[in-house]
Amino acid sequence: MTKREILQRLKGQLIVSCQAYEDNPLYGTENMVTMAKCVLAGGAKGIRACWPENVRAIRALTDAPLIGINKVMPSADTDFYDSVFITPNYESAVAVIEAGCDVVALDGTLRGRNEKELTELVQRLKAAYPDIVLMADLATVEEGIICEKAGFDILSSTLSGYTRDT
């Protein structure tokens, strides 16, 4: 699919997040595939999945637009509200792109980095993967303005409530 086709298929549609942490009974790739089957059967037109192994398995199931994230959770001594953890760097983005996502969602907040670093990450990904759709997970209007200028294709308020500013 082209970027335009992906964006058109997602516009105004239900996107369901299929993810679970290790301490959740639904944790595991097999369960995420089952969850994806259920949400698609229920009418979802897109899926958001975490970690390369889940993205790869769900991609094998469907050609529905797939948003990939690669959470890198902060260490116990790092404050959650100060951490960039949703696809925080180039390597984590490449892992879910190579696993088969159509859209890669990145942390679009400025926690732990500045606007220039975020813009450079976007430019590097666009140069290496010109057909991938880039989604900014952000928390504030100000971050939305910065992310739009940086070149993200989709802006989402996913992190509202998960940062010190919100």
What do the PLM-derived regions correspond to, one by one?
Residues K3-Q8, K37-L40, V55-D63, I97, ...:
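Surface-exposed amphipathic alpha-helices with a cationic face
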Residues P130-D131, I154-T166:
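Catalytic-face loop-and-helix region of soluble metabolic enzyme cores
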Residues E91, V96-G108, G112:
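Ordered, amphipathic secondary-structure segments that act as subunit-interaction surfaces
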Residues C38-A41, G68-A76:
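Metabolite-binding pocket within alpha/beta catalytic cores that recognizes anionic/polar moieties
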Residues L26-T29, R48-G68, A76, V84-P88, ...:
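Active-site-adjacent beta->alpha loops and helix N-cap segments on the catalytic face
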Residues M1-L26:
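N-terminal amphipathic alpha-helix/helix-capping segment at the start of soluble metabolic enzymes
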Residues L14-C18, I47, L66-N70, V104-L106, ...:
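Hydrophobic faces of well-ordered beta-strands that scaffold small-molecule active sites
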